[in-house]
């Protein structure tokens, strides 16, 4: 397959798709961006609006347009954002979207597969772990080329929370949130550190600042997305930046280690469910899944997260 160099397709022109479109353009790495939506006028409007930004200084002359699934044929990266999102008055659990959005994802994947099985697909649609599992296991598409955003945003939230409490730049906070992008996610505290200082020493070293409580941080991370949803009606900026981070790692073949969702195949003794663990991201997608050292309690939490997701997968109603 001959790709158009640095061509990206966004499927879905809703709040998230629009934010993703503008976020990836700001990378200044793309030659062409196509947006697809069931509402063609919405896609055209988003593309036209975004295209006007390319006239500003230091913006490359990117081709931005609305298109259709044929545009996937020579795309390097495809981002799936389509599907209903949680509303503030919904039951505030991403898993309630499972049946509906798996059907949406099924339709999208069937259309993509008509034209390519070479592009890297980034799955954003919630519940992202369920959607990622479905995409990886039902279309004979290379699994390493399908990546769910997973707990990448949760990890950014955790780092921001800890950085703020200790009054340090959150980019100097290291560690991961693992498992489900949702209620059973957890921070791998055994790996969290600031400048190499392990978490269990941080309260002593930063004794003039807030004493960080693990359970409090985990709850704040899990509640962050819901809090944004309640306040503004939807989430968009954080997840769009998460997508941009992945796109940059792929286009530049960075070999970056990021916590993303993929079907586990024996890692930590877990099989046949997609959830987030650290993965090496390259121009091929997921190059390698890493079993970082976890405490016994953290492995138990990962298994609990897996069991939670498996129960949803088992109960899916995928009648088309």
From Swiss-Prot:
GO terms for molecular function: L-lactate dehydrogenase activity. NAD(+) binds at residues 16, 37, 42, 69, 107, 124-126, 149. Allosterically activated by fructose 1,6-bisphosphate (FBP). Pfam families: Ldh_1_C, Ldh_1_N. It is found in: Cytoplasm. The keyword Oxidoreductase applies. One of its GO terms (biological process) is lactate metabolic process. GO terms for cellular component: cytoplasm. Pathway: Fermentation; pyruvate fermentation to lactate; (S)-lactate from pyruvate: step 1/1. InterPro entries: L-lactate/malate_DH (IPR001557), L-lactate_DH (IPR011304), Lactate/malate_DH_C (IPR022383), Lactate/malate_DH_N (IPR001236), Lactate_DH/Glyco_Ohase_4_C (IPR015955), NAD(P)-bd_dom_sf (IPR036291). Substrate binds at residues 94, 126-129, 154-157, 235. Beta-D-fructose 1,6-bisphosphate binds at residues 159, 174. It catalyses: (S)-lactate + NAD(+) = pyruvate + NADH + H(+). The keyword Cell division does not apply. Catalyzes the conversion of lactate to pyruvate. PANTHER family: L-2-HYDROXYCARBOXYLATE DEHYDROGENASE (NAD(P)(+)), L-LACTATE DEHYDROGENASE. NCBIfam families: L-LDH-NAD. This is L-lactate dehydrogenase 2.
């Amino acid at each position: 397959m001959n790709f158009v160099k640095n061509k990206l397709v966004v499927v879905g022109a809703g709040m998230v798709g629009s934010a993703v479109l503008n976020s990836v353009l700001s990378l200044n790495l793309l030659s062409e961006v196509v947006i697809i939506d069931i509402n063609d006028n919405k896609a055209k409007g988003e593309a036209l609006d975004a295209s006007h930004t390319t006239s500003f200084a230091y913006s490359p002359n990117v081709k931005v347009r609305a298109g259709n699934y044929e545009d996937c044929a020579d795309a390097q990266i495809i981002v799936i954002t389509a599907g209903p999102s949680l509303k503030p008055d919904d039951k505030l659990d991403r898993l309630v979207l499972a049946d509906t959005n798996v059907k949406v994802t099924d339709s999208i994947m069937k259309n993509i597969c008509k034209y390519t099985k070479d592009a890297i697909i980034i799955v954003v649609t919630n519940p992202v772990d369920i959607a990622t599992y479905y995409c990886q296991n039902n279309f004979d598409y290379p699994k390493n080329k399908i990546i769910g955003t997973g707990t990448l945003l949760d990890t950014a939230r955790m780092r921001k929370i800890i950085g703020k409490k200790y009054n340090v730049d959150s980019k100097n906070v290291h560690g991961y949130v693992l498992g489900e992008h949702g209620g059973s996610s957890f921070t791998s505290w055994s790996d969290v550190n600031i400048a190499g200082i392990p978490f269990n020493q941080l309260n002593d070293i930063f004794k003039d600042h807030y004493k960080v409580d693990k359970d409090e941080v985990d709850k704040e991370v899990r509640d962050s997305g819901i809090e944004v949803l309640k306040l503004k009606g939807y989430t968009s900026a954080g997840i769009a930046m998460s997508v941009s981070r992945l796109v940059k790692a792929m286009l530049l073949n960075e070999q970056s280690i990021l916590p993303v969702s993929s079907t586990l195949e024996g890692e930590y003794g877990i099989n046949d469910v997609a959830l987030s663990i650290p993965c090496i991201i390259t121009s091929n997608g997921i190059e390698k899944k890493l079993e970082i050292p976890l405490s016994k309690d953290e492995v138990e939490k990962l298994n609990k997260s897996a069991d939670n997701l498996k129960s949803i997968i088992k109960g899916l109603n995928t009648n088309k």
